[in-house]
């Protein structure tokens, strides 16, 4: 990683969680949550444990909202939104588009977001008051104004088995009116790559 968090206490925790995810890449167990295609691995759970432990240690009054655990209520209006492994299906299939995400909410409003691209070793930071950065360098979104030329990133929700036909109709309309569609399996990285001018929307 080429930079540190503004909230530096969590820097080592993110690196430790990322190392754990890498180390477990060829030795993990998989379970399904609400849907057959909504997976969780023991790597998700171990990475989450590392992040929650660090937040509890350094920011004991902050709340924690994590994908795999019960919510910890805040006593000061600050909460951390955690996804310890965004792109679990990718991870389970040895596709290296996965990320750790941390978002700081103040009075339920996001003010800072950190996304660590584990296998590319890139840190994306977003701030409500000063924009987005990749490895400390300011990002510039696309200047493309033509929808017909725009490259769009998208994904399908986990309830696609129930609403698949509706999603396909929407997807078809996007295909017909844009320059192309890409789907990489990590919503967090899709957003970061949009901020980094890899996608137009």
Task: Report residues per predicted region.
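Residue-level signal for inorganic ion chemistry
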Residues: 21, 44, 55, 88, ...
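Short, solvent-exposed loop/turn motifs
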Residues: 110, 138-140
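Generic detector of well-ordered alpha-helical packing
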Residues: 45, 49, 68, 84-87, ...
């Amino acid at each position: 990683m080429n930079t540190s968090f503004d909230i530096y206490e969590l820097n080592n925790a993110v690196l430790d969680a990322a190392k754990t995810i890498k180390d477990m890449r060829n030795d993990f167990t998989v379970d399904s949550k609400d849907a057959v295609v909504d997976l969780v691995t023991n790597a998700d759970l171990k990475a989450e444990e590392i992040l929650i432990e660090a937040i509890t240690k350094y920011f004991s009054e902050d709340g924690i909202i994590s994908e795999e655990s019960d919510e910890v209520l805040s006593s000061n209006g600050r909460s951390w939104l955690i996804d310890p492994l965004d792109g679990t299906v990718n991870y389970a299939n040895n596709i290296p588009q996965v990320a750790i995400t941390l978002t700081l909410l103040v009075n339920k409003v996001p003010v800072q977001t950190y996304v660590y691209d584990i296998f590319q070793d890139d840190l994306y930071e977003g701030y409500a008051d000063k924009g987005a950065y990749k490895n400390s360098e300011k990002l510039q979104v696309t200047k493309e104004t033509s929808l017909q030329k725009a490259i769009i990133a998208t994904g399908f929700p986990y309830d696609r088995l129930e609403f698949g036909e509706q999603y396909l109709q929407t997807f078809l309309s996007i295909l017909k009116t844009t320059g192309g569609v890409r789907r990489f399996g990590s919503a967090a990285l899709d957003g970061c790559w949009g901020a980094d001018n890899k996608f137009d929307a």
